[in-house]
Amino acid sequence: MHALLLARAGINVVVLEKHGDFLRDFRGDTVHPTTMRIMDDIGLIDEFLTLPHQKVDHIAFDGDGQLRTFGDLPLSRQRRANHLYTLICEEPDFLDFLAEKAERYPEFTLIRNAEVTDLVLEGHQVTGVRSSAREVRADVVIAADGRNSAVRAASGLQTAGESSPMDVLWFRLNRRPGDPNESFAVLRRGMLLAMIHRGDYWQVAHLLPKGTGAQRGSLDAFKKRLVTARPQLREHVDDLHTWDDTSHLDVRVDRLKTWWRPGLLCIGDAAHAMSPAGGVGINLAVADAVAAANILVEPLRTGSLSDHHLEAVQRRRELPTKVVQAFQVFLQNNAIEPVLSGDLSPIKLPFFVGRWPLKFIPPIAVGRGLRPERVHTPDVH
């Protein structure tokens, strides 16, 4: 998104992508109204909505064998007309879409199979990166390479961490006739599953107590636990043939103390790793990208970029990041961890989250966003 906005504004930009494509399993896929507004700002909302997606207007859960609805998300008729709703869209499709639109601009270059290995320095100033494909020099390097950012690791920037009581085991199960037509959570004492509707399959997030993700044991025993939690999965679990059909995510909630150094700016998960709770990660990353473009385009155009501009991006985006992370940590410690440890009855969890003032936070965070960004950069073409 950041590269698209720069190229759209007439700024030359090179994107280095580690892989040959964006087809990574179990990436973020929840697109909030704040991101939908941004797509509308740049005139791409109608084309974006032609991608496969599912609308989300409420939260459903199975706490006792029955599927129940809890917590409506903002989805009035007017909001539908203005595309202000939440949807689930596969991130590889989203990234391919943005890359395709960016490639319309001559200022945009995407180099695939180019893994960044180090920074190029002149004194303390970052002047480019070295990759497996080539060395690239730039007025500013934007690190948007995720929670395991190689650029961040090479930068020497310091991280401040928040504790997380959980890890996630991701896997997919094919949908069967009669399955629910909505995403939902399965809540049992000692177990939490998020069943994400992905069209012809379920993307399943199995939340685990921290540090237990690698203690896999018997796959058959694991499948039996899933069926015990939700008997309707009896046929679905046959789609798991080996542990290689699963992917372990070490959940971290952390952020850089300083997002920049001369010539370098970190955004998205490279600046602040988020918990998967709430599906906010991709939306905060897009907001970072838009804010960075709004602040950096003019100094890049005039050759007046300074540390002040990089610091301004952090100043703009740090507060919403801290607020969302604090809420994620609160939910992890006071709702998710007690269910996983067996201390909280799962049937009580939705009512805990629904208590005032917690019940007002999801609609505000999802519907309006915390310090929402709008595109102010021009299209010079």
Positions of predicted regions on the chain:
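Conserved FAD-binding catalytic core of PHBH/FMO-like flavoproteins
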Residues: 124-251, 255-256, 260
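A conserved short coil-to-beta-strand element within the FAD-binding core of flavoproteins
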Residues: 112-125
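Short FAD-binding loop at a beta-strand-to-alpha-helix junction that anchors the flavin cofactor
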Residues: 258-276
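Glycine-rich FAD pyrophosphate-binding loop
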Residues: 5-27
